[in-house]
């Protein structure tokens, strides 16, 4: 109900020409409707913008979380390369465009477990734990990153290498833990393998080695190391880069053997969250330094190592994970 404003108006009636005439006061009540003005302020709702959809889908995160390279977009979805190198159709997923960093958790699946520590710790699981922690750290720093595998499934070396090229990455780091155990050492036996013809790979390798060595040296452990441990090229007897994750990608790449899972004291350390946090943070520092500075790192070994590693998992033993 509107409020009423009551105004008392006093009328004075006077007799003409008679100053002493009686004055009659007539009270009059006038009712005036008051006007209430209401101002409506529009409500503004702030929401986060949806993720940017790349103009070209270079890779895809499938509904099951597997990252695959995209061969082409189709009317019904995507044609992709599976982790085992097969072609498959996927109806939906999260498209990925150009990505700054690709992290490769070495090994994976039932057959390719990698080395196993005396405490039962499997290299494939440890590599993934470190890689996922590194991914989370890089995301916090505003750096785009994707993993070549996101769970315990097999993935062929050529497919992993191709993913880095497919997303036009600035760099790739393949994460590993070493075996067999060499002789005792006063410091960690971190080894970083680099591309023999790439100065960028050499610079990245030096940054990775320096940061990881500094982080691991804070732990009181009976370390083991090879005599030539450091940043080095590893060549096959044919004279080529020996490791598939080094020779395969066009992308600037390094393979980091962080320390020796085959050494029991080191394996006990690797089973702790403190280790995973320390080494992933060190790797993130190295990546950020590579992308934002001209720093060159340290630990370079002049003479290449000659070695013929075992080939990666073949197509006959590779079992693809579910994509949808």
Where are these regions (language model features)?
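Catalytic-site microenvironment of enzymes
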Residues: 3-4, 8-324
